[in-house]
Amino acid sequence: MAQENPDAKTLKAAIAKFLKDEKSNIAALKHGSGLESALFGRMVTSDVLASRDAAVYVAHAFTVHEAQVENDYFTVVDDLLREAGEQGSAGIFDTELASGLYYGYVVVDVPQLIANLEGESAKDWATLPPAKRELSGRVVQHLLHLIPTVSLGAKRGSTAPFEWAKFLLVEVGDWQPRSLAGAFQNALPLEQPALRESAVQMLTDEIGKLDAAYGTTLDRRFLALDKVDVPNAQRLSLNDLATWVQTYITQGTSPDKVV
């Protein structure tokens, strides 16, 4: 386009005409990238206007206690070599394994998710009718079922790494999100009695400190296996927790505030 329009004025006019002609195509590209791109974003190097910002941010999980690594020794045997009557193996290796209690953190940018799924402006999400927020509510509802119940699948054959979350906290608000990772600035010792209960207590203590410093600005609900008191929060089952969030997003306000 620049070669065809060397003059700045004609180039500007050509770009404006191109954008006008391609406006519907660009909108279709943004709206037609599928659920995965709506959740986790998409980068298109050939057309930056077709890129999409992620609506879900996932932090790297870390253990809340001192890590202890074990070496797992294993060999890979060459069956053909053995059948030939020779000694040896195709490889001798070891892998490092660690079993820990992890803290994970996930943020869902609801306005961005609605914008990605519905093709609306993120800043206008609160004024949209419930029908425009319904799909996003259902997506987050399903996501909330997946986060605590689906484990990473690496080395499944030799470790069976399947587990469900023991504590799940959901906070909803319009402030910038904030992690509770600072609760574990000082890692728990491995010999800590009642390790899981101690970790949850550290989280609730951190919540109390943040509330005291910044005020209670978030609606929160939680799931827990153990007896725990979370400041300004109600305990729910996973199904009720996911339904609460879905209703919150669809209505645009806390379900408890709707008469």
Q: Residue locations for each model-derived region?
A:
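Basic polyanion-binding and macromolecular-assembly surfaces
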Residues: 1-259
